[in-house]
């Protein structure tokens, strides 16, 4: 899961330790809470409703893995509200059915739920056949199923490595190849979208299995963007930065210690929201993006460029300190 697929469910009106200014908004039946400590966040308010015109996906079929919660649920909600017939899949059928019923009642479009463990190629094969049976060949395929946990790499067991790579890399491959074969047979195109993470490109300590697997997912999608365009398929990638969802943060920031640090290194001054990611995802999967293929879109409020700049930490220097520094620089030889 992207180091952080998150906008988190909290049934609170105020936390015991008041974190400063807050924004509350609703998503489905849940209340989401987000800290907005950084003053500049007021310049970057999130838009929480679909940006595409109504019925942008009318008559289209969308298949979303990991569609029962978090980012997957948000993307499914937006696609359904824009007219798509959605089919969601994951291992937990009870959560899937509840989400499908919730979105169906909200949008008026039937959402189907299919239990699927993407680690099992036989189950993936049967799921794709059921998808085609209940809804037809998909026009949109979103590979969102993921798994992650933090651990020093020297503490990793072979099973820990295998658990993550089986879900993220192998699972994405099984779904993509199986659906691709069916689409080629039917002579039908589709838009594929993979949800990865900003550290798929840079790498990251303490999440090495996820970083490695997500990097593989990106290579896979870029390879297929080149190879399967001739069949009417295009492939794009979103690299989310910190988007707080309960599921991801329970494993990646279980103590809540790192959230403030995250916000401090995001130039936009806040975490992202699931709705913002859903807007980007629906655009990339829509006909409005028909000439976007093989793209990797970083969606992180500027976090990656801040972290990669050698001198970006100088933002903490005050005006008075800059006056002193400037005076010292002017006294150096060659100034």
Curated annotation (Swiss-Prot):
The active site is at 199 (proton acceptor). The keyword Lipid metabolism applies. It is found in: Mitochondrion. Its EC number is 1.3.1.124. Coiled coil: none annotated. The modification N6-acetyllysine is found at residues 42, 49, 97, 106, 244, 260, 315, 319. Transmembrane segments: none annotated. Auxiliary enzyme of beta-oxidation. It participates in the metabolism of unsaturated fatty enoyl-CoA esters having double bonds in both even- and odd-numbered positions in mitochondria. Catalyzes the NADP-dependent reduction of 2,4-dienoyl-CoA to yield trans-3-enoyl-CoA. This is 2,4-dienoyl-CoA reductase [(3E)-enoyl-CoA-producing], mitochondrial. It comes from Rattus norvegicus (Rat).
